[in-house]
Amino acid sequence: MEKKYLRKHFALYLCLVILNLAFIWGNSFVPGEISGEISGGIFEVFSDLFAVFGDKGQFVLRKLAHFSEFTALGFFLTGLWRNISCREHVTAPLLLGLAAACIDETIQIFSPGRGSSLIDVWIDFSGVCLGFLLSRLLRHLLDRKAARKGPHT
């Protein structure tokens, strides 16, 4: 029963990682002009929230989008790795997330009207780290809750 449970969760996290990476990298292939139009449309919807940033509002929105997508990736990678290995590993999900951020910025070098940014790699990696921490925190809280209930009979 335990192996079946792990396989199901492994498949779920693997799908989530693949979908998340497809979304992230797919957006990196979008030419700069179209990407700007998309983020401009999203900015219009949330313009009141970003008004405090003045003319930098759209810039902040784009960086927040980077951070958010990579936070999700960090969360999913940590869950995936937990189902691959018996032990909790810190380095594997974080290094995989950093590699994904580097690949993302490399893709943008070859996308028309786009460019690569070292700052974006750091923003992306910070998101991965937050996702990792949130996943570990959730796992800790769930384990504590299960320990209070005691073993299932």
Across the structure, where does each feature detected by a protein language model lie?
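Alpha-helical transmembrane segments of integral membrane proteins
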Residues: 8-16, 88-96, 119, 123
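Interfacial helix-loop-helix junctions of multi-pass membrane proteins
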Residues: 101-125
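Membrane-interface helix-boundary motifs at transmembrane edges
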Residues: 3-8, 81-88
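Short helix-capping/hinge motifs at transmembrane helix termini and TM-loop junctions
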Residues: 30-31, 82, 112, 139
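"…centered on the first transmembrane helix and the immediately adjacent amphipathic helix/loop
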Residues: 2-75
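Short, charged juxtamembrane terminal tails flanking transmembrane helices
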Residues: 146-153
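Small-polar-interrupted transmembrane alpha-helices in polytopic inner-membrane proteins
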Residues: 17-24, 90-109
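Membrane-interfacial alpha-helical segments at the cytosolic side of multi-pass membrane proteins
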Residues: 68-83, 126-142
